[in-house]
Amino acid sequence: DFKLKEVAYSVILLVMMVPMQVTSAGFVSFMSDLKLTNTYWPLIIPSIAAPAVVYFMRSYMKSSFPLDIVEAARIDGCGEFRTFLSIAIPMMKPAIAVQAIFAFIASWNNFYTPNMILISVDLKKKTLPMMVSALQSSDKFNDYGAIYLAIALSIIPIIIAYVLLSRFIIAGVALGGVKE
């Protein structure tokens, strides 16, 4: 707990309301200053601490994380860091899994930000939506069967991510169903 907790949360909610297109010029300039253009880091890191993730995780903790467990851990002599790693993180796995799936899908389908950050003409530094767009807009390549096959194959990583992370969601639902 800290004094301006609610103010900080309100600022995070206000940031959620600002469209990405409004801040994109500043974001690209900042990434250029950090020499991170033409890398994938500006596409990965912002989704970890996105305002929607903070909002969802806070809501999940307030509704599903009993503070009695933290107090019991403190009484047992467990430090804050160990309480976080041993108790909070395992209880938060369903929410972390949901946010990981949402962040992965949003990043995977994002066209706008990679189109500004990955500015080299090298085709090795493109995301899948950029490649599909290049295929669809090409005058020389009009094999629509291959284009639609590429689009269909682009779903496979999303399915793999869901299959790998869904067990945490199911375990969380089962854990939440057991009440005293």
Question: Where do the language-model regions lie?
Answer:
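A structural signal for multi-pass alpha-helical bundles of membrane permease subunits
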Residues: D1-E180
